[in-house]
Amino acid sequence: MRFYNREKELNYLKNYVQLEPNSILFVYGPKSSGKSTVMMRVIKELENSNIVFFYYNLRKYATPTKDEFLSIFFEKSDKKYLLNKLEINLKIFKFGIEENFDFNNIKLNDVFAKINESINTVIKDGKRPVLVIDELQKLKNIYFNSGKSLLNELFNLFVSLTKMEHLCHVICLTSDTLFIDNVYRNSSLSEASEYYLIDWLKKDDIKKILKEEGFNKKEIDYCLNYLSLPYEISQLINNKKLGLSVEETIKRWINIEADGIKYLIDTSDLNEEEIYKVLSKFKDKIKINYKKDVKKEEMKYIKFLIENEILFYDVINGIIKPTSVKKWYAIKEILDK
């Protein structure tokens, strides 16, 4: 898929990884807003620099077990870090571990010791390590010896690597905003974390892209009311090549989204009337303010809609909105029926 205009986000992250590590960076945003694409572009554009990227994309895997976590993050080798052979187009690395290392009896402290060894070796080689984990929250149900939570202990390690020792940048990408909410309210991370939002595309950028792709003024004006995410533009371009009009494509999207939302509500054990009451907050506006517009008793319905990717919660700015503009129109459609 073409890399659409994300120069602001691209430059921010390129500059960020070249500063001294001082905090964990959480890059968050609505699903499909382009977080992973931007991060991979950063890695690609800096592949000839002295930065060594350890990039782990957990969205590629089913929710991993302890053993799978170890095989994802480590490669048996006589080197402390080595190129990931499975990634052909990106120069990214994995942590190295001895050939005879026994994964069956490994303790969490051993895991962290090996990560530290790899990072320190990168630094000794005159290079700068950056650890990137995409969809980090998928590790939240993994426990090691004595019931230790892998994710909680990883956060402690990340604080040590960044804020305390300034050895390595740690960047975590996620679209799970309830996970971000938990992190944001975690007192042990409050002074050691930063947050960066990659949100919907701006209308001016969408207009420019569509013009470059040969859409006429009428089509562009229509699209600007509905588009917000990069993949939507790609689908729209492909559908036009297949003979579908802009109106047909977008109406089809909204119908599919509306049917999906209705099915979700119809099959939920939650109070249907209360869910619709929450959705009605978006009948006349695309976003609401968490502090002003949400009551305590509404939170379980809000959470339900966030968990099912109907709504997006920007915890840092206190805003709740649909995950996309087309989702907003789907919400409005089911409210009108």
Curated annotation (Swiss-Prot):
Q: Tell me the residue numbers annotated for binding ATP.
A: G29, P30, K31, S32, S33, G34, K35, S36
CDD domains in the cross-refs: AAA (cd00009)
Q: Which UniProt keywords apply?
A: ATP-binding, Nucleotide-binding
Gene Ontology molecular-function annotations: ATP binding; ATP hydrolysis activity
Q: What does UniProt list as this organism's lineage? A: Archaea, Methanobacteriati, Methanobacteriota, Methanomada group, Methanococci
Give start-end of the signal peptide. none
Query: Pfam families given for it?
Result: ATPase_2 (PF01637), MJ1010-like_2nd (PF21690)
Name of the protein in its database record = Uncharacterized ATP-binding protein MJ1076
Please state which protein family the record places this protein in: Belongs to the archaeal ATPase family.
